[in-house]
């Protein structure tokens, strides 16, 4: 079956008033089992040196109980020790499979290591081995890891371990060449593992995990796993745990309308919450004719966990609710209608739906609007609008998702593409008049190839943005697009390097000139040969392990293989060389005459400024700001400056490299005058008496 998933929307409904905290009547047996399992493996921190009074700005590390690995970190707050990080874990690769195979001691090759920061002083746990163990012992249903997870204490360290476990399972399905679809047994047991760390006892422990993105990682991992789920019947309830529920339904283009209802039990409410997902008829008709499916995953407590870990939204006017719905929708479906039961029906409260943005760790109101808010139900219309990938991703070690950056990128690239096309048209018009000498010929060859490389790179960058929401399903296409982007952006830089070398050649060599054919050969070898070698080596080395592209965008990988260095290092090295060339030009331009007047000095300053302004976009000096975006946690303003300067580079090339060149302007005027002269001559010929007599003689 062809890949059909194009979008995952994470939506949450919340009220303006706090809800009651009474326990539910439903799932009472499951709740009792949950409490019993916790009592079996009670976690009791040791009494030790991190007790009593303390001095401000001090910290204290305390070892975990004897049957746990890791440590507990305390910091002093108002003269009292306060727990900040806890990495105590009892889970490991061996303990997961001990019940299935007591003598199991997995020593399989692994590409994913559990971060040291999450387990304190324990040895690194090769989480990648877990998936290989699953493939060995229980590939059909994943049941072999469920008991070990459910019997473990819900410590912060174990929560982090389980999140990494679920994340690894999901990513291995996508990237390890194992493309089997997820059946209902796998989804059910995967849900049981996730359910263990979503209970009310676990909520407060999420705050002490070193990785503050763990809750968001869990949400994305479950979504990624649910993407592979194949629904067999018309409507199926797959996972029905206390803290996670999954339901799927088949949908088709021919349906008049479609709805999917889900009754979600609430741990802190007396009644279940009924959620109805409707797909409008018009949205269904826009789908492809092949039958598809929609999947909803409900997390009754994940909203509370996200609130516990992430900072509150200052822009939202209402307190957030705990229920989160993840919707896995087919390709082309951009609109849905959500109907929720209000939790507290006795109060008159206003409500709204929002979407979770994992990049910013914030809720976003823009995708959803409230259609009705009457009595006990709320109805919202939610649309999925895919934004263009931010231009700052080209140098960034971590993609920055921001509306301002997206707008700058979209507007800048549109203007740049138009400007570069216009630049090439002008070059074609004036070519015969401006390429008089070898140096002028090579100068315009450089400008044309710089424009062609940047134009092609920008077009492929936009195409790559359209794959960013579905990178895993379109992996081969994403690799191809990334390779072309990589090659043409490198070609841009190497042609700018060759132009800088031509400038140095013109300054240093006055009387002796190189043959045009030799200069052309050197130019194309540098401009296209070097980038091709770098791009081919990069994809050859990294792609066998599927580490060439990012997991969330069609661009060079950073986290696993550092393939981004294959672009950043050559680009920044060329920028450094070109900066030295600009300084050399500035020094060469400022030769003052003896006894020169103040006006002559000002003319020199103006000439230097003009040369620097012209050479800056043509030699790519604006890309020097990319050095700041390579650093994690850098302020958004640097990304904005980088996007502004480089998204508009095509416009700057047209302005400073073409329009401000007086020879090109003169050639254009001559061309226009020549065309006007020809048109006048044609008019005179058509209106001449001789021509008129010939017409009459016919």
Swiss-Prot record:
Expressed in squamous epithelia. Disulfide bonds join 353-380, 368-382. SMART domains: GPS (SM00303). It is a multi-pass membrane protein. One of its GO terms (biological process) is erythrocyte development. The keyword Protein biosynthesis does not apply. InterPro entries: Adhesion_GPCR (IPR051587), GAIN_B (IPR057244), GAIN_dom_sf (IPR046338), GPCR_2-like_7TM (IPR017981), GPCR_2_Ig-hepta-like_rcpt (IPR008078), GPCR_2_secretin-like (IPR000832), GPS (IPR000203). It is found in: Membrane. Disruption phenotype: No visible phenotype. Keywords: Disulfide bond, G-protein coupled receptor, Glycoprotein, Membrane, Receptor, Signal, Transducer, Transmembrane, Transmembrane helix. Residues 250-401 form the GAIN-B domain. Residues 431-444, 508-518, 588-611, 657-698 are cytoplasmic. Orphan receptor. This is Adhesion G protein-coupled receptor F4. It comes from Mus musculus (Mouse).
């Amino acid at each position: 079956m062809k890949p059909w998933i194009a979008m995952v929307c994470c939506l949450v409904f919340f009220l303006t008033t706090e809800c009651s905290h009474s326990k539910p009547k439903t799932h009472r047996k499951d709740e009792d089992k949950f409490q019993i399992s916790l009592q079996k493996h009670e976690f009791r921190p040791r009494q030790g040196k991190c007790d009593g009074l303390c001095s401000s700005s001090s910290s204290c590390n305390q070892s975990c109980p004897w049957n746990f690995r890791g440590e507990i970190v305390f910091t002093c707050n108002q003269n009292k020790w306060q727990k900040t990080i806890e990495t105590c874990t009892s889970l490991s690769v061996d303990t997961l499979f001990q019940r299935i195979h007591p003598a199991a001691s997995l020593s399989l090759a692994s590409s994913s290591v559990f971060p040291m920061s999450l387990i304190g002083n324990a040895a690194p746990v090769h989480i990648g081995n877990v998936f290989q163990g699953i493939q060995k012992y229980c590939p059909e249903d994943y049941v072999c890891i469920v008991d070990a997870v459910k019997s473990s204490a819900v410590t912060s360290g174990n929560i982090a371990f389980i999140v990494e476990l679920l994340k690894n399972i999901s990513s291995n399905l996508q990237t390890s060449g194992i493309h089997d679809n997820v059946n209902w047994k796998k989804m059910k047991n995967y849900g049981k593992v996730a359910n263990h760390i979503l209970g009310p006892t676990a909520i407060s422990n999420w705050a002490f995990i070193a990785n503050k993105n763990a809750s968001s990682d869990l949400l994305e991992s479950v979504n990624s796993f649910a993407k592979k789920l194949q629904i067999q019947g018309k409507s199926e309830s797959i996972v029905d745990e206390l803290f996670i529920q999954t339901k799927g339904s088949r949908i088709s283009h021919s349906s008049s309308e479609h709805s999917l209802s889900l009754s979600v039990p609430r741990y802190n409410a007396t009644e279940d919450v009924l959620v109805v997902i409707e797909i409008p008829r018009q949205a269904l008709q826009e789908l492809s004719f092949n039958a598809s499916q929609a999947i909803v995953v409900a997390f009754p407590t994940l909203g509370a966990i996200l609130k516990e870990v992430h900072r509150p939204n200052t822009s939202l006017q209402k307190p957030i609710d705990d229920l989160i719905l993840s919707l896995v929708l087919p390709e082309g479906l951009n609109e849905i209608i959500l109907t929720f039961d209000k939790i507290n029906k006795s109060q008159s409260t206003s409500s709204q739906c929002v979407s979770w943005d994992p990049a910013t760790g914030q809720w976003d109101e823009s995708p959803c609007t409230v259609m009705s808010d009457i009595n006990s139900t709320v109805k919202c219309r939610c649309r999925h609008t895919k934004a263009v990938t931010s231009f700052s991703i080209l140098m960034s070690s971590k993609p920055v998702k921001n509306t301002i950056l997206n707008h700058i990128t979209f507007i800048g690239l549109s203007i740049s593409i138009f400007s570069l096309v216009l630049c090439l048209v002008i070059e074609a018009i004036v070519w015969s008049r401006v390429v008089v000498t070898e140096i002028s010929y090579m100068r315009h060859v450089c400008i044309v190839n710089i424009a062609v490389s940047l134009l092609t790179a920008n077009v492929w960058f936009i195409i790559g943005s359209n794959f960013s929401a579905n990178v895993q399903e379109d992996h081969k296409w994403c690799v191809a697009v990334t390779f072309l982007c990589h090659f043409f952006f490198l070609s841009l830089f190497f042609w700018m390097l060759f132009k800088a070398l031509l400038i140095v050649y013109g300054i240093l060599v006055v009387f002796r000139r190189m043959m045009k054919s030799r200069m052309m050969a050197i130019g194309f070898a540098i401009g296209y040969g070097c980038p091709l070698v770098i791009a081919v080596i990069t994809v050859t080395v990294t792609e066998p392990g599927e580490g060439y592209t990012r997991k969330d965008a069609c661009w060079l990988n950073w986290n696993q293989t550092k393939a981004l260095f294959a672009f950043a290092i050559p680009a920044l090295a060329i920028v450094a060389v070109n900066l030295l060339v600009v300084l050399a030009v500035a020094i060469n331009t400022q030769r003052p005459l003896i006894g020169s007047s103040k006006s002559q000095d000002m003319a020199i300053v103006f000439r230097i400024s003009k040369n620097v302004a012209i050479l800056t976009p043509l030699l790519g000096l604006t890309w020097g700001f990319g050095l700041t975006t390579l650093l994690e946690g850098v302020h958004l303003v640097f990304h904005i400056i980088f996007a502004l300067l480089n998204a508009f580079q095509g416009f700057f090339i047209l302005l400073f490299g073409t329009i401000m060149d007086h020879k090109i302007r003169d050639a254009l005027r001559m061309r226009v005058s020549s065309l006007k002269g020809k048109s006048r001559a044609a008019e005179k010929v058509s209106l001449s008496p001789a021509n008129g007599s010939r017409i009459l003689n016919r």
